[in-house]
Regions:
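Transmembrane helices and adjacent periplasmic/lumenal helix-loop junctions
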Residues: 175-194, 329-340
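Primarily membrane-embedded glycan-assembly and transfer machineries that use lipid-linked glycans
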Residues: 2-172, 197-335, 419-427, 431-557
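Transmembrane alpha-helices and membrane-interface helical segments
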Residues: 112, 116, 156-167, 194-198, ...
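Short amphipathic alpha-helical segments
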Residues: 320, 324, 335, 339, ...
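Ampipathic, surface-exposed secondary-structure segments
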Residues: 86, 330-358, 545
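Hydrophobic core segments of transmembrane alpha-helices in multi-pass, intramembrane catalytic enzymes
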Residues: 150-159, 185-188, 205, 338-346, ...
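Aromatic-enriched
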Residues: 347-435, 456
Length: 557
């Protein structure tokens, strides 16, 4: 079964002319609406505020701090100071001439990335036209061009690093990856990955490049200015939220899920609540734990055969899995970062990733491509009656596309580590095996009536708990959702607002004092209902759960 998106892309792949014309037309249209929006003076905003400003400062004045600013460090030295010298030659040109020159260099870099990525693909895949189309219509790519950012240059470096690794030049590949990490800090995750893989030549190359850049920056700019860059431009982003609509991270999504449209145009840092910290930690830990288990599982296998050069399916899958992880888990992941997903998409259509050739993979990859390729447009400040729904869903479409791609890659990594050598080495408990059997059964064949009933009940409960409640939460008026959150927070903190949650708070306090802390004195309902006259509408057993929540909250925070 083919997804409509997959079939359309394959149709485009058959015609270079169609890919170029249709992709070029979409590129032209998306360029007109993509952020930064008119007036035209804001075109190349990142380039003017950061790269050109730093290059001009270094060329005309010399090393000097560009902070403190009234806003977070999204201008001036956005990279470690020494990298500012890369842009100093552009200061010899006027601002407009420098910006269009930088755009031209970006087009050359993207063209080279496309050509090199095509070389990575298998010849029989014949995916050149399809890759051209994906590059032309990619919304984050066009957004990066209009902002004058450097993310599309990083795409070229990642493809180059993969080519060097394929050729067996691991130290050189590490050097390139080190430069990538210096330009985009979330890519430091590659260092952790290659340490876990014990690819010491790549680790040595990355450490050499990063060490050289840091040492050179210290030598040229001095210790104080480099520490200032870290304190103003790196440290504030760790553990805080940038809620603007073009930030597509787990943090931003969770914040918008609760906050709605109130901060869609806020490009300043917000201190997260304890509930947000807990949810973020839970989600990020689950993602990294899953990735770690996949890699550990792959490590137990015999070395996989190479599928391109010296690289195996595991090497390619995990390489693109790491970049995907870096995008979705970074504290601040701007929309244009997601153009880096062109790397896994290209390898997928190039036949290098060996993902399962089934409907689930096609739908996941197709959905990821559609969502993460949408144009990045400047949203109006008032979204009207659809604000509660759009701010919690469509605004995070790029992030959803990244998550769908991540699931497709993780699923492929799971199936790639299921050879016959591991088939008989299972030590699952019987209840786990039964649960897996129920989950994997596509229909009722082979299941007993009791198993069918159990499976249907589980499906019903999951749908009711996850889907129905999620829809109700998303479509609920913001005031109602916000009130529920405040009640929950006050409840966990031991505060009561004398509203409908007051009886619960009183019941919990009484329960903790009389039932948890000895000595036991009076029955619960006797005290609450008859002596205090309160109408507690929850069963007594629920208080054990609420008390456990309070205890966990106290231990955790």
């Amino acid at each position: 079964m083919r997804s409509p998106m997959h079939s359309m892309l394959r149709a485009v792949d058959r015609s270079w002319l169609g890919a170029g014309l249709i992709g070029g037309l979409i590129l032209f249209l998306v360029w007109q609406i993509s952020a930064p929006a008119p007036p035209a003076s804001r075109l190349f905003a990142d380039f003017f505020d950061a790269y050109y400003a730093v290059g001009e400062l270094l060329w005309r004045t010399g090393p000097a701090a560009t902070w403190p600013l009234d806003e977070p460090c999204i201008a001036g030295f956005v990279n470690i100071p020494i990298l500012g010298w890369l842009f100093a030659p552009l200061a010899l040109l006027s601002k407009q001439a420098a910006a269009w020159t930088f755009l031209g260099l970006g087009v050359v870099a993207v063209s080279a990335a496309w050509a090199l990525l095509r070389r990575l693909c298998r010849p029989e895949a014949e995916c050149g036209a399809l890759l051209l189309f994906l590059f032309l219509v990619n919304g984050p790519m066009i957004h990066s061009f209009r902002e004058g950012n450097i993310t599309h240059f990083v795409l070229l470096l990642l493809v180059l690093a993969l080519l060097l690794w394929r050729a067996g030049s691991e130290y050189a590949a590490g050097l390139v990856l080190g430069l990538c990490a210096a330009l985009k800090l979330p890519l430091l995750l590659y260092g952790v990955y290659f340490v876990l893989r014990r690819r010491w030549r790549i680790v040595a190359g990355g450490a050499t490049m990063i060490g050289f850049i840091v040492a050179l920056s210290l030598a040229v700019f001095g210790l104080a200015l480099n520490i200032g860059w870290h304190d103003y431009c790196v440290a504030p982003f760790v553990g805080r939220i940038m809620p603007g609509f073009n930030v597509q991270s787990i943090d931003a999504f969770l914040f918008r899920l609760l906050d709605g449209q109130a901060h869609l145009h806020a490009w300043y840092l917000i201190e997260p609540t304890r509930a947000h910290k807990f949810m973020r930690t839970l989600v990020v830990a689950a993602i990294f734990a899953g990735a770690f288990l996949l890699m550990r599982r792959a490590k137990r296998l015999e070395p996989m055969p190479a599928v391109t050069g010296t690289l195996s399916t595991r090497d390619l899958l995990e390489f693109v899995l790491v970049v995907n992880l870096a995008l979705v888990t970074s504290p601040v992941s701007w929309s244009h970062y997601y153009l880096l997903l062109l790397l896994p998409w290209g390898l997928y259509f190039g036949g290098c990733l060996s993902l399962p050739d089934d409907a689930a993979t096609k739908w996941l990859m197709g959905g990821g491509i559609v969502l993460a390729s949408l144009p990045v447009v400047m949203l109006p400040k008032d979204l009207g009656v659809l604000a509660p729904l759009m701010s919690r869903t469509l605004v995070s479409a790029t992030f959803f596309g990244g998550m769908l791609t991540l699931v497709a890659l993780a699923r492929g990594a799971w199936y790639a580590t299921q050879p016959s050598a591991l088939a008989g080495r299972t030590s699952r408990p019987s209840w786990v095996a039964a649960a897996i059997r129920l989950a994997r059964s596509g229909g009722r064949g082979g299941l007993s009536p009791s198993e069918v009933l159990t499976r249907n009940m589980v499906i019903f409960l999951v749908i009711n708990a996850c889907v129905v409640n999620a829809i109700l939460w998303i479509t609920a008026p913001f005031g109602f959702a916000d009130t529920v959150l405040h009640h929950t927070r006050d409840f966990l903190l031991g505060r009561s607002n004398d509203d409908s949650w007051g009886p619960m708070m009183h019941a919990l306090e009484y329960f903790e004092n009389e039932y948890v802390r000895p000595p036991y004195t009076a029955p619960l309902y006797t005290e609450l209902v008859f002596h205090r006259g309160e109408k507690f509408q929850y069963p007594p057993s629920s208080l054990f759960f609420f008390a456990g929540m309070r205890a966990a909250d106290a231990l955790m925070f």
